[in-house]
Amino acid sequence: MELFRRTLAGLLMLVVAVSVGICVQGKFIDAVRLPTHTRVIGATYTTLSDPFYETINDEIQMQIKSNGDLLLVRDPGQDQERQNQEIEDMLNKGIELLIVNPVDYVGVTPALEKAREKGVPVILIDSKVDDPELVTCTITSNNYGAGLLDARHLISQTKSARIVLLSNSDSFSSWDRLSGFCQTLTKSGNDYRILELRDCGGELNRAMRAMVQLLETFPRIDVVMAVNEQAALGAMAALEEKGVLSSTLVYSVDGSPEAKALISEGLMTATSAQSPLRIGRMAAEVVYEILEGKPYLTNIVVPVNQITQEDILRYGTGGWQ
């Protein structure tokens, strides 16, 4: 359990560090005088306190910088109104292309409409939106497949379980993952019971509070399915506090180094691993295909892989895939 405590403490410190760092970065970037030939691209993510989005951004940043261009980065901290304001601000600063992972797949629509009015192409990351006509290119993991893989592993472990689902109601990818999970369990014909679907925004602290409440409501929970690893870690903290972590199967999606270490120790059951490195590289490639008028794909789906204790050595625990 010591590994889990160190992992949780480190992630909580990261949330604070990233939040402070991104504010400083934003002020610095806006003050830079750019060469006239430099292209300026805007990027905004649900939250950069999630290492998944931080890794995607780092990969894009590296590619953009290597081309002598500039990436304006904004972190709305899971606030859609703030994200819309930041997008409008970047559009007014003259960005040539926008990369966005929306806080709310419906609520982001006004900002995307303004991008279209200004003729700024949009690359959507790890989500869908209410109006796909407002988006130039969409890059997502196989989110339905991620839920399906977690469900298949659960089916291989037990034919009967009481399950709670931790979701992010504003995220399209969250619903895809839970659809893949629940539909696969239903098709199995086994005795699986969904006790409750609880929205925690995919956030660590909210998931921890939600799990505390769920444990008070339900005397027995066999399985937790969390839509991302931040939510899974929050749930695991509550399960450990209650003394039932070792008897609860915990599934998630992401494939972070922290989660892989916990899987290696037998503390987390399995995760469907995304590849933020690959997503970031693909996004950067599409940026220049669009800006240079080259052919590009409008919909890119990146495969996911299941990671369990049985095959953790194949993936390692030292970094993202």
Residue ranges and their predicted role:
Residues 83, 138-164, 175-176, 204-208, ...:
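Hydrophobic alpha-helical segments within soluble ligand-binding/sensing domains
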Residues 105-145, 156, 162, 256-264, ...:
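Flexible loop/hinge segments that line or gate small-molecule binding clefts
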Residues 102-115, 181, 196, 200-260:
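Hydrophobic alpha-helical
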Residues 8-11, 21-30, 185, 278-321:
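Hinge/cleft segment of the Venus flytrap/periplasmic-binding protein
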Residues 52-69, 146-150, 173-191, 206, ...:
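Short, solvent-exposed amphipathic alpha-helices that sit
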Residues 1-38, 113-118:
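Short, low-complexity disordered leader/linker segments with a strong preference
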Residues 40-59, 63, 67, 72-85, ...:
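Extracytoplasmic "Venus flytrap"
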Residues 41, 60, 148-197, 287, ...:
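An alpha-beta-alpha
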